[in-house]
Amino acid sequence: MESLSLIQGKFTESEAVDIISSMVEVKIKFHENKITNTSNEEDIKMQEARIKELQNDLAALKKSIAAKGRKIEVKAVVTVG
């Protein structure tokens, strides 16, 4: 298995929110592009559901980060197997 460490470190609240939000926005745009390039209703619904899930998860994570009020440890690893 191959892996890529994208993020590893301690960040301020605003830095953590910025970096995580940026990554989630890239993933949302990926799903939006998939919607644009398909006419299959089932695929569109799956992409829309995933976008909503990402938005909800990001909102919850932002609340959690705000509640901590200190440096936040963030790790993001992509593993390909």
Listing of model-derived features with the role each one plays in the protein:
Residues 1-81:
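Extended, charge-rich alpha-helical interface modules
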